[in-house]
Design a protein with these regions (language model features):
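Generic structural detector for well-ordered beta-strands
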Residues: 31-35, 83-85, 111
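Beta-strand/loop substructures that line and gate deep hydrophobic ligand-binding cavities in soluble
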Residues: 98-162, 167-169
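Hydrophobic-ligand-binding modules of eukaryotic lipid transfer/binding families
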Residues: 7-33, 113-122, 146-151, 162-176
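Hydrophobic ligand-binding cavity/cleft-lining segments
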Residues: 9-65
């Protein structure tokens, strides 16, 4: 049964079964299974410049400091700043995001899992993006980030599976 969460969240519905909330109104996740190893998938997710190939909110990134990058939103044309906190041991990345460098704060996270750990064939990886809704985020802005992350999953998979991710054997780092 679908139920509207609140007037503030009128575009987002919760799926309930026996009065248990199934869809989280505060966090959105998008995942996709890719035919590449987890290490390669993680390298793409953890490389701030190469993310400019798939991150629609921060396209065509350039590095401005050790872990800080700036790109351009395909939606507004305005700059989007991103700072990465990379944890290679856990194949995890936290992303601070803002319109200005001084405004950077935690917004998104990525995890990469070896597909075989979840029963998928060897040589596969599960890539997941998470985002959390800000207290003052409009319905439109929330809908945009959620649907954007879902679209980005297909870009990530296409880049990794085609070898156009900027990894080994793909020296062209220019986003197309």
């Amino acid at each position: 049964v679908l139920h509207e969460l609140s007037s503030r969240s009128r575009f987002f519905f919760s799926l309930t079964e026996k009065d248990n909330l199934v869809i989280d109104a505060h966090c959105h996740s998008s995942s996709i299974l890719v035919r590449t190893d987890a290490a390669r998938a993680f390298r793409l997710m953890a490389d701030g410049e190469r993310q400019g190939r798939w991150a629609l909110g921060s396209w065509r990134r350039r590095q401005v400091a050790d872990t800080t990058f700036v790109g351009e939103s395909v939606f507004s044309g305005l700059p989007t700043w991103v700072r990465l906190h990379v944890d290679p041991a856990r194949l995890a990345v936290d992303y601070d995001v803002a319109a200005t460098e001084s405004g950077l704060r935690f917004r998104n996270a990525a995890r990469v899992l070896d597909g075989s750990a979840l029963g998928h064939p060897p040589g596969t990886a599960l890539v997941t993006l998470f985002t959390w809704r800000l207290a003052d985020q409009s319905d439109d802005a929330w809908a945009q980030i959620c649907s954007t992350h879902e679209t980005e999953m297909f870009l990530i998979r296409a880049l990794l599976e085609s070898g156009r991710d900027g990894g080994e054997g793909d020296e062209d780092r220019t986003p197309s």
